[in-house]
A protein has these predicted regions:
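NAD(P)+-binding Rossmann beta1-loop-alpha1 motif at the extreme N-terminus of oxidoreductases
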Residues: 1-56, 62, 66, 122-123, ...
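NAD(P)-dependent Rossmann-like dehydrogenase/reductase catalytic/cofactor-binding core
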Residues: 16, 196-264
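Short, conserved loop/helix-junction motifs that constitute active-site signature segments
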Residues: 24-25, 80-85, 102-105
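Active-site capping/gating segments
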Residues: 33, 111-129
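Internal alpha-helical scaffold of NAD(P)-dependent oxidoreductase catalytic cores
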Residues: 44, 99-109, 124-161, 172-210, ...
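Rossmann-like NAD(P)-binding element
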Residues: 56-83, 87
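ADP-ribose/adenylate-binding Rossmann-like module
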Residues: 84-96
Length: 264
Protein backbone atom coordinates (compact mmCIF):
# COMPACT_ATOMS: atom_id res chain seq x y z
CA UNK A 1 0.00 0.00 0.00
CA UNK A 2 1.20 3.53 -0.80
CA UNK A 3 2.32 5.84 2.02
CA UNK A 4 0.71 9.26 2.52
CA UNK A 5 2.97 11.35 4.72
CA UNK A 6 1.64 14.45 6.47
CA UNK A 7 4.41 16.92 7.31
CA UNK A 8 2.75 19.18 9.84
CA UNK A 9 0.21 18.59 12.59
CA UNK A 10 -1.60 21.92 13.10
CA UNK A 11 -5.21 22.98 12.55
CA UNK A 12 -5.33 22.25 8.82
CA UNK A 13 -3.68 18.84 9.14
CA UNK A 14 -6.09 17.93 11.93
CA UNK A 15 -9.11 19.14 9.94
CA UNK A 16 -8.10 17.03 6.93
CA UNK A 17 -7.39 13.96 9.04
CA UNK A 18 -10.70 14.29 10.88
CA UNK A 19 -12.73 14.57 7.70
CA UNK A 20 -10.87 12.13 5.47
CA UNK A 21 -9.06 9.52 7.58
CA UNK A 22 -11.66 6.79 6.99
CA UNK A 23 -11.30 7.11 3.21
CA UNK A 24 -7.55 7.73 3.19
CA UNK A 25 -6.72 4.81 5.51
CA UNK A 26 -8.25 2.42 2.96
CA UNK A 27 -5.91 3.70 0.24
CA UNK A 28 -2.75 4.67 2.10
CA UNK A 29 -0.64 3.97 5.14
CA UNK A 30 -0.81 7.29 7.00
CA UNK A 31 2.32 8.86 8.48
CA UNK A 32 2.66 12.11 10.41
CA UNK A 33 5.96 13.87 10.94
CA UNK A 34 7.38 17.31 11.59
CA UNK A 35 9.42 19.04 14.27
CA UNK A 36 7.38 17.66 17.21
CA UNK A 37 4.81 15.26 15.71
CA UNK A 38 4.09 13.70 19.11
CA UNK A 39 1.92 16.75 19.79
CA UNK A 40 -0.82 15.30 17.57
CA UNK A 41 -1.04 12.02 19.55
CA UNK A 42 -3.94 13.12 21.84
CA UNK A 43 -5.93 14.27 18.80
CA UNK A 44 -5.37 10.95 16.99
CA UNK A 45 -6.49 9.06 20.07
CA UNK A 46 -9.57 11.23 20.58
CA UNK A 47 -10.68 10.84 16.95
CA UNK A 48 -9.62 7.18 16.72
CA UNK A 49 -7.36 7.88 13.73
CA UNK A 50 -4.85 5.20 12.81
CA UNK A 51 -1.62 6.92 11.76
CA UNK A 52 2.07 6.35 12.43
CA UNK A 53 3.89 9.19 14.19
CA UNK A 54 7.43 9.45 12.81
CA UNK A 55 9.85 11.54 14.91
CA UNK A 56 12.09 13.97 13.02
CA UNK A 57 15.81 13.33 13.41
CA UNK A 58 18.28 14.37 10.73
CA UNK A 59 16.00 14.11 7.70
CA UNK A 60 12.48 13.21 6.58
CA UNK A 61 12.34 10.08 4.44
CA UNK A 62 10.05 10.99 1.54
CA UNK A 63 11.20 8.32 -0.91
CA UNK A 64 8.38 6.91 -3.08
CA UNK A 65 5.75 8.55 -0.84
CA UNK A 66 2.87 10.93 -1.36
CA UNK A 67 3.91 13.90 0.79
CA UNK A 68 1.38 16.47 2.06
CA UNK A 69 2.96 19.73 3.25
CA UNK A 70 0.80 21.30 5.98
CA UNK A 71 3.13 23.55 7.96
CA UNK A 72 3.96 27.28 7.89
CA UNK A 73 5.39 28.34 4.50
CA UNK A 74 8.54 29.83 6.03
CA UNK A 75 9.45 26.42 7.50
CA UNK A 76 9.88 24.78 4.08
CA UNK A 77 13.69 24.85 4.19
CA UNK A 78 13.93 24.04 7.90
CA UNK A 79 13.73 20.32 7.12
CA UNK A 80 16.03 17.99 5.20
CA UNK A 81 14.19 15.74 2.76
CA UNK A 82 15.70 12.38 1.83
CA UNK A 83 14.86 10.55 -1.39
CA UNK A 84 12.44 11.27 -4.23
CA UNK A 85 8.73 11.55 -3.50
CA UNK A 86 6.09 10.27 -5.89
CA UNK A 87 4.04 13.40 -5.32
CA UNK A 88 4.28 16.53 -3.19
CA UNK A 89 0.93 18.06 -2.28
CA UNK A 90 1.48 21.55 -0.94
CA UNK A 91 -0.96 23.67 1.06
CA UNK A 92 1.79 26.23 1.72
CA UNK A 93 0.32 29.65 0.98
CA UNK A 94 2.38 31.70 -1.44
CA UNK A 95 4.97 28.98 -2.13
CA UNK A 96 5.29 28.33 -5.86
CA UNK A 97 6.34 25.25 -7.80
CA UNK A 98 9.90 26.52 -8.24
CA UNK A 99 10.43 26.91 -4.50
CA UNK A 100 8.91 23.46 -3.93
CA UNK A 101 11.07 21.74 -6.54
CA UNK A 102 14.18 23.52 -5.25
CA UNK A 103 13.50 22.19 -1.75
CA UNK A 104 12.03 18.74 -2.41
CA UNK A 105 12.73 16.18 -5.15
CA UNK A 106 9.50 14.69 -6.52
CA UNK A 107 8.05 13.19 -9.70
CA UNK A 108 4.87 15.26 -9.36
CA UNK A 109 3.80 18.45 -7.60
CA UNK A 110 0.32 19.64 -6.66
CA UNK A 111 -0.42 23.05 -5.14
CA UNK A 112 -3.73 23.38 -3.29
CA UNK A 113 -5.74 25.74 -1.09
CA UNK A 114 -8.02 23.75 1.29
CA UNK A 115 -10.01 25.21 4.17
CA UNK A 116 -11.03 24.15 7.67
CA UNK A 117 -14.36 22.74 6.44
CA UNK A 118 -12.17 19.75 5.56
CA UNK A 119 -13.12 18.36 8.98
CA UNK A 120 -16.61 17.69 7.56
CA UNK A 121 -15.26 16.68 4.11
CA UNK A 122 -16.73 19.95 2.80
CA UNK A 123 -13.61 21.85 1.80
CA UNK A 124 -13.69 23.68 -1.52
CA UNK A 125 -10.14 23.26 -2.77
CA UNK A 126 -8.46 24.88 -5.76
CA UNK A 127 -5.60 22.82 -7.22
CA UNK A 128 -2.94 23.09 -9.91
CA UNK A 129 -0.37 20.47 -10.93
CA UNK A 130 3.18 20.44 -12.28
CA UNK A 131 4.72 17.47 -14.11
CA UNK A 132 1.37 15.69 -14.42
CA UNK A 133 1.74 11.91 -14.57
CA UNK A 134 -1.64 10.21 -15.08
CA UNK A 135 -1.50 7.50 -12.39
CA UNK A 136 0.26 9.62 -9.77
CA UNK A 137 -1.95 12.60 -10.58
CA UNK A 138 -5.09 10.51 -10.14
CA UNK A 139 -3.99 9.33 -6.69
CA UNK A 140 -2.92 12.81 -5.61
CA UNK A 141 -6.25 14.28 -6.67
CA UNK A 142 -8.07 11.50 -4.81
CA UNK A 143 -6.41 12.75 -1.62
CA UNK A 144 -7.85 16.23 -2.20
CA UNK A 145 -11.29 14.85 -3.07
CA UNK A 146 -11.36 12.82 0.16
CA UNK A 147 -12.00 16.00 2.19
CA UNK A 148 -14.25 17.95 -0.18
CA UNK A 149 -14.52 19.04 -3.78
CA UNK A 150 -11.59 19.74 -6.07
CA UNK A 151 -11.54 22.64 -8.56
CA UNK A 152 -8.68 22.49 -11.06
CA UNK A 153 -7.42 25.93 -12.08
CA UNK A 154 -5.16 26.93 -14.96
CA UNK A 155 -2.04 28.06 -13.12
CA UNK A 156 -0.51 28.27 -9.66
CA UNK A 157 -1.27 31.97 -9.27
CA UNK A 158 -4.98 31.15 -9.37
CA UNK A 159 -4.56 28.74 -6.45
CA UNK A 160 -3.27 31.67 -4.41
CA UNK A 161 -6.13 33.84 -5.73
CA UNK A 162 -8.64 31.30 -4.42
CA UNK A 163 -7.95 32.42 -0.85
CA UNK A 164 -10.59 35.04 -1.71
CA UNK A 165 -13.27 32.46 -2.50
CA UNK A 166 -12.54 29.49 -0.27
CA UNK A 167 -9.61 30.24 2.05
CA UNK A 168 -10.06 33.43 4.04
CA UNK A 169 -13.68 33.49 2.87
CA UNK A 170 -14.82 31.31 5.78
CA UNK A 171 -13.43 33.82 8.27
CA UNK A 172 -15.21 36.65 6.43
CA UNK A 173 -18.47 34.68 6.42
CA UNK A 174 -18.02 34.05 10.15
CA UNK A 175 -17.93 37.82 10.62
CA UNK A 176 -21.22 38.05 8.69
CA UNK A 177 -22.75 35.29 10.84
CA UNK A 178 -21.61 37.01 14.04
CA UNK A 179 -23.07 40.32 12.86
CA UNK A 180 -26.44 38.75 12.00
CA UNK A 181 -26.56 36.98 15.36
CA UNK A 182 -25.88 40.26 17.18
CA UNK A 183 -28.49 42.02 15.05
CA UNK A 184 -31.05 39.47 16.20
CA UNK A 185 -30.09 40.06 19.83
CA UNK A 186 -30.38 43.83 19.33
CA UNK A 187 -33.93 43.36 18.08
CA UNK A 188 -34.94 41.22 21.07
CA UNK A 189 -34.01 37.58 20.35
CA UNK A 190 -31.96 35.73 22.93
CA UNK A 191 -28.43 34.69 21.89
CA UNK A 192 -29.22 30.99 21.50
CA UNK A 193 -32.30 31.51 19.34
CA UNK A 194 -30.58 34.15 17.26
CA UNK A 195 -27.59 31.89 16.52
CA UNK A 196 -29.86 28.94 15.70
CA UNK A 197 -31.80 31.04 13.18
CA UNK A 198 -28.58 32.31 11.58
CA UNK A 199 -27.19 28.76 11.30
CA UNK A 200 -30.31 27.54 9.53
CA UNK A 201 -30.26 30.58 7.25
CA UNK A 202 -26.71 29.68 6.19
CA UNK A 203 -27.76 26.08 5.51
CA UNK A 204 -30.69 27.24 3.41
CA UNK A 205 -28.54 29.77 1.57
CA UNK A 206 -25.95 27.09 0.72
CA UNK A 207 -28.70 24.95 -0.81
CA UNK A 208 -30.06 27.88 -2.83
CA UNK A 209 -26.58 28.70 -4.07
CA UNK A 210 -26.22 25.21 -5.52
CA UNK A 211 -28.87 26.06 -8.12
CA UNK A 212 -29.01 29.85 -8.38
CA UNK A 213 -26.72 32.85 -8.74
CA UNK A 214 -26.51 35.25 -5.76
CA UNK A 215 -28.23 38.00 -7.75
CA UNK A 216 -31.23 35.74 -8.40
CA UNK A 217 -31.56 34.94 -4.70
CA UNK A 218 -31.62 38.66 -3.89
CA UNK A 219 -34.32 39.27 -6.52
CA UNK A 220 -36.50 36.51 -5.07
CA UNK A 221 -36.36 37.96 -1.56
CA UNK A 222 -36.68 41.67 -2.29
CA UNK A 223 -40.10 43.22 -2.93
CA UNK A 224 -40.83 46.81 -4.02
CA UNK A 225 -40.45 49.17 -1.04
CA UNK A 226 -39.98 46.10 1.17
CA UNK A 227 -37.95 45.50 4.31
CA UNK A 228 -35.10 43.61 2.62
CA UNK A 229 -34.38 46.18 -0.09
CA UNK A 230 -34.38 48.84 2.63
CA UNK A 231 -31.67 46.94 4.49
CA UNK A 232 -29.69 46.22 1.32
CA UNK A 233 -29.66 49.90 0.44
CA UNK A 234 -27.94 50.60 3.77
CA UNK A 235 -25.30 47.93 3.08
CA UNK A 236 -24.66 49.35 -0.40
CA UNK A 237 -24.45 52.88 0.98
CA UNK A 238 -21.90 51.73 3.56
CA UNK A 239 -19.83 50.07 0.82
CA UNK A 240 -20.07 46.54 2.22
CA UNK A 241 -19.72 44.88 -1.19
CA UNK A 242 -16.58 46.88 -1.97
CA UNK A 243 -15.20 46.23 1.51
CA UNK A 244 -15.45 42.47 0.98
CA UNK A 245 -13.74 42.70 -2.41
CA UNK A 246 -10.98 44.87 -0.96
CA UNK A 247 -10.52 42.55 2.03
CA UNK A 248 -10.13 39.56 -0.29
CA UNK A 249 -7.67 41.49 -2.43
CA UNK A 250 -5.59 42.36 0.64
CA UNK A 251 -5.56 38.73 1.80
CA UNK A 252 -4.39 37.50 -1.60
CA UNK A 253 -1.73 40.20 -1.82
CA UNK A 254 -0.44 39.36 1.66
CA UNK A 255 -0.11 35.69 0.79
CA UNK A 256 1.18 35.94 -2.77
CA UNK A 257 4.95 36.09 -3.41
CA UNK A 258 6.08 39.55 -4.51
CA UNK A 259 6.95 38.32 -8.00
CA UNK A 260 3.39 37.08 -8.59
CA UNK A 261 1.45 39.35 -10.93
CA UNK A 262 -1.67 38.37 -12.80
CA UNK A 263 -2.15 39.79 -16.27
CA UNK A 264 -4.93 42.35 -16.49
Amino acid sequence: MEILQFIGYGNMAQAILEGAHEILSKRFILEITGRNPEKIAPFLQEKNIQAQIVPYKDAIDIHQKFVFLLFKPYNLKDFNYQGQAKSVLSALAGVGFKALSDAINSLHYLKCMPNVASKFALSSTAVCEKSPMPLISQKALSVIESFGNCVRVGNEELVDASVATNGSALAFLSLVASSLKDAGIREGLNARDSLELVKMSFKGFAKLLEKERPEMIIEQICTPKGATIEGLSVLEKKGVRGAFIKACQKSVKKMRPKNYTLKK
